[in-house]
C-alpha cells in the first residue's frame, strides 16, 4: 500500500509514433540520450584469471553481471584500458545471440571494481543529464518482454543480431528526469525484495541439502550401531535395495500416445511427455490424451529418463507418461514414496552420470533398476520424509511469494513505462 500511494492515474495523453504517451513526455531516439554506444574490445581472452577481467557474451546471460563468467586479457594498451573500462551506470546490451537471449541487458554497479568491456556486447553509456541509467535498464527489459528486439533483429542459423544503427534509432518514451528516477526506484525496490526472497530460498535449500545428508546416513531416530554398505555407512537395521527389486518396486517406462490424441480440453487422462511441467514436488500437466498407453497412479514417483535426466516429481493423480519419463510404483506396505522421492533427488548427480562417469542423454530401465537406495523401517522412512516435506513447504511458500511479487512488478512496470499511471514527484 505504501508503494501504491505514490501513484496517480494519468488522464491526458498525446498520440506519437510509438503510441499514446502523457502530454509532458517526449519521444527520443536512443542515440540522443547516450554518451557512448559501441562494441567492446577485441582481444584474446583466457579463463585462467591472468590479466585484466573483461566481459564475455555469457557474462550477462542471467540479466546481471556475473563475475564468475568473466574472461581475462593480458596484453592491452593503456589507451584501450581508458577507452574500454566500464564506469558505474554503463549498460551492456546483448546484440548478437540466440533469439532467446537477444536484447538482454545488465547494468554495471561497480563490481568488480575494475572491468573491461569485451566484444559481442554493446556498451550503452547513458547521458545522466537526460536519462536515469536504471530507467533505461528497465525500459530495455520492458522492450524485451514485448519482443521488440526479436522483431527488429536479423535472423541467421542459431543466431540473431541487431546492428548499432538500428539500436541508435530505437525510439523511446522519455518522462521528466525526476520521474524517471522515481520509476527506477520503485522497480529497484521490487527487485531488491525479490533478491531478498531468493536469498531466503537459497538458505532453505542449503539447509535442506545438509539435512538430507544427515537423514540419509544417520536417520531420524537415535541409532547406536551402524554398518558399512555399498552406498556408505548406514544404521544397522536399514536395508539397501535396488529399484529393480520387485519385492519393493515396479518400474514403468513411458510410451507416448499418438499425437492426434493430445488435447488441452481435458479429454481423457492428463499427459506428461517429459519434465517440462515438473514443479518442486508435483507436476502441472497442460496436455491430455484420450489414448493413454503407459499410466501411473496417485503418489507414484516420476523420473526424467531423457536429458536432463534424474529430475523427480510425485504424481498428484493418475497420469499418462511419455517416453521422456518413467514411473516408479512402490509396495506401500514396505516403502514410503516420499522417502524414495527425496532420496532420488538427493542422488540426482549420481543418476546423471550413470554408466562410466559420462553424462548420458538417456537412461534405460536397466539403469534405473540398478539404482541402490537405503531403506529404513517404514516408520522411519515416513519420519524422514515428513521432515524434508516441512522444509519443502517453506520453500514453496517463498516461491509463491516471489511469484506474486514478480507478477505485481511486471504489471506496475508496464503501467509506469507507458505513463498510464504516474509517480508523484
UniProtKB/Swiss-Prot annotation:
Task: State a single Pfam family of this protein.
Answer: Methylase_S
Extract the GO molecular function terms from the UniProt entry.
Answer: DNA binding
Kindly list the biological process annotations in GO that this record carries.
Answer: DNA restriction-modification system
Keyword Disulfide bond carried by entry: no
CDD domains this protein is in?
A: RMtype1_S_MjaORF1531P-TRD1-CR1_like, RMtype1_S_TteMORF1547P-TRD2-CR2_Aco12261I-TRD1-CR1_like
Q: Does the keyword DNA-binding apply?
A: yes
* Superkingdom: Archaea
Instruction: Report keywords, A-Z.
Output: DNA-binding, Restriction system
Coiled-coil region list:
none
Its transmembrane ranges are: none
UniProt cross-references to InterPro entries, sorted A to Z: Restrct_endonuc_typeI_TRD, Restrct_endonuc_typeI_TRD_sf, Type-I_RS_S_subunit
Task: State the family named in the UniProt similarity comment for this chain.
Answer: Belongs to the type-I restriction system S methylase family.
Q: What does this protein do?
A: A putative specificity (S) subunit of a type I restriction enzyme thought to recognize 5'-TAGN(6)TGC-3'; the other subunits are unknown.
Domain description: Contains two DNA recognition domains, each specifying recognition of one of the two defined components of the target sequence.
Q: What is this protein called?
A: Putative type I restriction enzyme MjaX specificity subunit
Organism expressing this protein natively: Methanocaldococcus jannaschii (strain ATCC 43067 / DSM 2661 / JAL-1 / JCM 10045 / NBRC 100440) (Methanococcus jannaschii)
* Phylogenetic placement of the source organism: Archaea, Methanobacteriati, Methanobacteriota, Methanomada group, Methanococci
Amino acid at each position: 500500500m505504501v508503494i501504491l500511494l505514490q501513484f496517480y492515474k494519468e488522464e491526458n495523453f498525446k498520440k506519437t509514433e510509438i503510441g499514446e504517451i502523457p502530454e509532458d513526455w517526449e519521444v527520443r531516439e536512443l542515440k540522443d540520450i547516450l554518451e557512448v554506444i559501441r562494441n567492446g574490445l577485441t582481444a584474446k581472452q583466457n579463463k585462467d584469471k591472468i590479466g585484466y577481467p573483461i566481459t564475455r557474451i555469457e557474462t550477462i546471460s542471467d540479466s546481471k553481471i556475473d563475475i564468475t563468467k568473466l574472461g581475462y586479457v593480458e596484453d592491452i594498451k593503456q589507451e584501450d584500458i581508458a577507452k574500454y573500462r566500464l564506469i558505474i551506470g554503463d549498460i551492456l546490451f546483448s546484440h548478437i545471440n540466440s533469439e532467446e537471449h537477444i536484447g538482454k541487458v545488465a547494468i554495471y554497479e561497480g563490481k568488480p571494481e575494475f572491468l573491461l568491456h569485451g566484444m559481442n556486447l554493446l556498451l550503452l553509456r547513458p547521458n545522466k543529464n537526460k536519462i536515469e541509467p536504471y530507467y533505461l535498464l528497465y525500459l530495455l527489459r520492458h522492450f524485451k518482454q514485448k519482443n521488440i528486439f526479436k522483431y527488429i533483429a536479423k535472423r541467421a542459423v542459431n543466431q540473431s543480431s541487431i546492428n548499432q544503427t538500428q539500436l541508435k534509432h530505437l525510439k523511446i518514451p522519455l518522462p521528466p528526469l525526476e520521474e524517471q528516477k522515481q520509476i527506477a526506484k520503485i522497480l529497484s525496490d521490487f527487485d531488491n525484495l525479490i533478491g531478498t526472497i531468493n536469498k531466503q530460498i537459497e538458505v532453505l535449500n542449503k539447509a535442506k541439502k545438509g539435512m538430507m545428508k544427515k537423514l540419509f546416513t544417520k536417520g531420524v531416530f537415535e541409532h547406536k550401531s551402524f554398518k558399512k554398505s555399498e552406498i556408505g555407512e548406514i544404521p544397522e537395521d536399514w536395508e539397501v535395495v535396488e529399484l529393480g527389486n520387485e519385492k519393493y518396486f515396479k518400474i514403468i517406462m513411458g510410451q507416448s500416445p499418438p499425437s492426434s490424441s493430445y488435447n488441452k480440453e481435458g479429454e481423457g487422462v492428463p499427459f506428461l511427455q517429459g519434465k517440462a511441467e515438473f514443479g518442486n514436488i508435483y507436476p502441472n500437466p497442460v496436455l491430455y490424451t484420450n489414448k493413454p498407453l503407459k499410466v501411473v497412479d496417485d503418489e507414484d514417483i516420476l523420473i526424467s529418463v531423457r536429458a536432463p535426466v534424474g529430475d523427480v516429481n510425485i504424481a498428484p493423480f493418475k497420469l499418462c507418461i511419455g517416453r521422456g519419463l518413467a514411473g516408479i510404483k512402490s509396495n506401500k506396505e514396505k516403502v514410503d514414496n516420499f522417502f524414495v522421492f527425496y532420496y532420488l533427488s538427493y542422488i540426482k548427480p549420481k543418476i546423471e552420470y550413470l554408466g562410466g562417469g559420462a553424462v548420458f542423454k538417456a537412461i534405460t530401465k536397466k539403469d534405473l533398476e540398478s539404482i541402490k537406495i537405503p531403506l529404513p523401517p517404514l516408520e522411519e522412512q515416513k519420519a524422514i520424509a515428513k521432515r524434508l516435506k516441512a522444509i519443502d513447504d517453506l520453500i514453496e511458500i517463498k516461491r509463491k511469494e516471489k511469484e506474486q511479487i514478480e507478477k505485481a512488478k511486471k504489471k506496475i512496470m508496464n503501467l509506469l513505462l507507458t505513463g498510464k499511471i504516474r509517480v508523484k514527484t
